[in-house]
Design a protein with these regions (language model features):
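N-terminal secretory signal peptides and thylakoid transit peptides that target proteins
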Residues: 1-15
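N-terminal Rossmann-like dinucleotide-binding module
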Residues: 11-77, 155-158, 244
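Contiguous beta-strand/loop segments that form the cofactor/metal-binding neighborhood of enzyme cores
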Residues: 162-163, 172-175, 180, 187-223, ...
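Conserved SAM-binding strand-loop segment of SAM-dependent methyltransferases
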Residues: 81-86
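N-terminal Rossmann-like NAD(P) cofactor-binding module of classical short-chain dehydrogenase/reductase
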Residues: 99-100
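Nucleotide donor/acceptor-binding cores
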Residues: 31-33, 147, 177
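Beta-strand-loop-alpha-helix segment that lines the small-molecule cofactor/substrate pocket
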Residues: 104, 109-157, 171, 387
Length: 401
């Protein structure tokens, strides 16, 4: 069966998306949500373009320690936007209501908690933290505050992903014992655009990270160096493991094992190819395969139960009944349910954030679920770097070998 939009919403009824492309109580021109953007690399500029498509907000300030990027962001925000290199100037501005944080991972905790302390609502990219301890601190502080904090795991605000959750909850898959996740990218190192060092505050870029000399590969591809990011595990697996947590109603694995190597990009610290396996409560396991060698097939998840399989990615959802699949020699069945993505999940996710700023309700990707997803990624990286399986002690909140 091919689901159209009408049958989609019928199937997904009872699950609140928490998103609206236009709000009934949208604020007027003098009552808009005034937003500053801290860290204006490519992802942050993409988020800015999404915000410009949504009603009731205004981009009023941009901050980056590298002037050329700050000026690129200012072109998006508009000529009247304030331009600063020190993020604290945005947080000190009482006329700014909220901030978008698009910095490298190692800055996420500090700027997010500074923003919350300053009374700002926050949209911070994933992973929300650079370590498990950072994430735990963020949960404690943010949940004790009155601020709205949304994290960039946009699947939680994306229509066909919400339908996927409804299918899982319906029991149509039977007993789910295996979830396969994968994400393939294509990347190269070297041939970097020259950096104008007179326009970069490298010390401020490093911030809480260890002091070290400037290297262009660390500036441009910081995700793949342990001082600043967590490689393809925290960059990519975090999205999918958040979906696993959400769909399966779990918040942490029992244990993790991982292996990886730099087969193609020797310059990086973090491996360009990784496999990880995670054992979960509720008698199921999940795997992750990630590589930066080839982008063919991109990324997605497969939930396998004894009655059926759900395959989902950012373009579509497909449910397969398993009746014929167990007969030797038969081909895989045609999908019983097929839904193609009807929109942009980042756009609806940012709308959810704006709506929650107005209503003061909990956003779809709130700090606790964001921490749980990042924590599982950090656990997988701990196993990867240790070279053996590690266990998670959920009572003591610590990793055990």
């Amino acid at each position: 069966m091919i689901c159209n939009r009408r049958t989609f919403f019928a199937a997904a009824s009872g699950l609140a998306l928490g998103t609206r492309m236009a709000t009934a109580n949208a604020q007027g021109a003098n009552d808009r949500i005034r937003i500053g953007v801290i860290g204006t690399g490519g992802r942050a500029r993409g988020l800015m373009n999404h915000l410009k498509r949504l009603p009731g907000n205004e981009l009023v300030a941009v901050c980056d320690v590298y002037e050329p990027r700050m000026l690129q962001a200012a072109e998006i925000a508009g000529t009247t936007a304030t331009k600063v290199a020190d993020y604290r100037r945005i947080l000190d501005d009482r006329g700014i209501d909220a901030v978008v944080i698009g910095t490298p991972d190692h800055w996420h905790k500090t700027i997010t908690l500074d923003a919350v302390a300053g009374g700002k609502d926050v949209y911070v990219e994933k992973p929300v933290s650079h370590t498990i301890a950072e994430g735990a601190e963020m949960v404690k502080v943010i949940e004790a505050s009155k601020q709205i904090v949304q994290t960039g795991t946009q699947q939680r605000s994306w229509e066909h992903w919400v339908l996927g959750k409804a299918i899982i909850d319906s029991g149509r898959l039977g007993q789910i014992t295996f979830v396969q996740t994968y994400w393939y990218q294509h990347a190269r190192a070297g041939n970097y655009t020259p950096v104008d060092m007179d326009k970069l505050d490298w010390k401020r870029w490093l911030g809480p990270a260890a002091d070290q000399p400037f290297r262009p590969e660390r500036f441009y591809q910081w995700r793949h160096y342990w001082d600043f990011g967590g490689g393809c595990v925290t960059d990519l697996m975090t999205h999918w493991i958040d979906v696993v947590h959400w769909y399966m109603d779990v918040d942490a694995p029992l244990s993790a094992a991982a292996t990886g190597r730099n087969y193609n990009i020797k310059l990086w610290e973090a491996p360009d190819t990784v496999t990880a396996t995670l054992e979960f409560p509720k008698n199921f396991m999940a795997s992750y395969v990630g590589t930066y060698v080839s982008k063919v097939d991109d990324g997605g998840l497969e939930f396998r139960g004894d009655l059926g399989t759900l395959k989902i990615d950012r373009t579509r959802l497909a449910f397969y009944r398993d009746d014929a699949a167990n007969v030797p020699g038969t081909l895989a069945p045609e999908p019983e349910t097929l839904v193609r993505s009807s929109g942009d999940g980042t756009l609806t996710h940012m709308q959810n954030w704006l709506d929650c700023i107005r209503s003061r309700k909990t956003p779809n990707a709130h700090i606790r679920v964001a921490h749980q997803a990042a924590r599982t990624s950090h656990l997988a990286n701990a196993a990867l770097r240790a070279g053996h399986r590690v266990k998670w002690n959920s009572v003591a909140e610590r990793i055990e070998s």
